[in-house]
Amino acid sequence: MRSFLYMLSQRPKLACLCGKSIIIWPGKRTNLPENAFTQRMLQECGQMAKPDASVDLDNFKAISEQSPAEFGIDSCRVKAQPEDRSDRIREQIASAYPVIHERTLLLFISFLEHKLTFGSEQEKAIYKDMTVVDLVQRLLAKRCVWFFGANDYYRTMQGNIGNEGFEAVGTPAEKEPLTLTSVLSYDEIKLSALLYVSCHSEFINNGSRVNGGEVLQNKDTIEREGVVIGLIGARFERPDVMEYQDIMITKTQNTEANGYGFDLEQISSETVTPASDLRRIWREFYEEPRDFIYADTPYDTTRFEEVSQGIFDHQVMRKRYAISFDTLLLEAQDRAFKAGKPAYIHVVGIGLGVWKAARQQERTFLESFEGRLRALGERLSHIGVVHFSWFHLACVGSLHDGAIIPVDKHPQGGIRIRNSVRNPGDKLTEDMLPVVTYAWDGNALPGNEFWANMLISTGDPAAACSTLISELQNPHINVHYMNGANLHIASVEHGLLHVGDYARRLIV
């Protein structure tokens, strides 16, 4: 059961950033296991092919009309767009897919193996014979319509509305309507937070937080279309679940009974427990040799910060960000390369709003982003500008408005940095591909609060009101493209590949 992610990982390298030693992670290669379960999972991935279904726009609209989730407005739907945009919209529909980091693919495999061995009866029944592609499809399709707030206010796809109860999903204590057959468990939502969605889309307006779906008649002040990527930050609103398990160190959570405090060498087949094995797969995902009992946490102010709940681990937070940033940068690079023009990436602070849990979290975000820009280097030949919008810190490391991050062989010598307030759809002054990000959620459809008719609230509904993502990135509407079989993998070594192409490169 000992995972390849730890055993075969390369020794982490260090870089100096802001006077601190920052681990360069992940490395350029993710080594693969040779165990039979992983090889079988990759073999099954290798059988997948890109969808070749042609886009029938009338059928797409008909499926949307049957959606069990009600649209608050129609201006952001395909049916409301001008007829002369139909050909472009067909291309945008076909451009949609889910995307994960290559390390996340291997994490999903470890998760399935763990649950088949240590899962509850409910979990074993669900995961029996499940492939990675099946798991991704489940993470897309079984999420709620909306899911937000510290009390987990939700509406399921079946129309049930309520608060709380997700901690029991997948256990003998689960109750209708929150059962594993209908919704995701918190262990799955944690995985789902590493699963992102991407597509080209129309821009209806400038995408401001208060756009409310207004149809801008004068298109001269906005970009007509661009790439829209839903990223998900670390969520700390509920204790003892999600990234809280990996990044928060508390008296009640970080105990041996909950699987914490063990070195890998301490655990054997005789001493392993479901809790310690679940901690193992996450430690190995982040390539951390151990996680900490609260009382044994080392004194290291460059890594740890005291917060109201306990201790916040910035090293693991930085790694969590790195997975998101690698995926964003490699996805934007591929989209821009295919478009034949440099990408202008609009970056928002995922997890830095109501989910923010530490004073230094924004600094860690920006440090991690700079680290990944430098680490990916020559892979980012088609990244022209990275624009940080609505950040409080004007300068962290080399990231400040007007900076250039040097990149060998880059057509412009490097990647330009902007740090100022702008709207995602604002007109660019150069011929570049707009790539805009929005802060999504691991247990909601794209738009989240949008579906609760809260159109003017956060970046999630703002993105849904200003683009076509509520349909194009919706697995219940864009059924031929936004599905597990169309999963794409962002690889530091190989670039952006369909899961079938990626797996065929790796199969032993």
Curated annotation (Swiss-Prot):
GO MF: ADP-ribosylarginine hydrolase activity
InterPro entries per the UniProt record, alphabetical: MavL-like
Membrane-traversing stretches: none
Highest taxon, organism lineage: Eukaryota
EC main group: hydrolase
Job description of the protein: Protein ADP-ribosyl hydrolase that specifically removes mono-ADP-ribosyl modifications from protein arginine residues.
The name this protein goes by in its record: ADP-ribosylarginine hydrolase CG3568
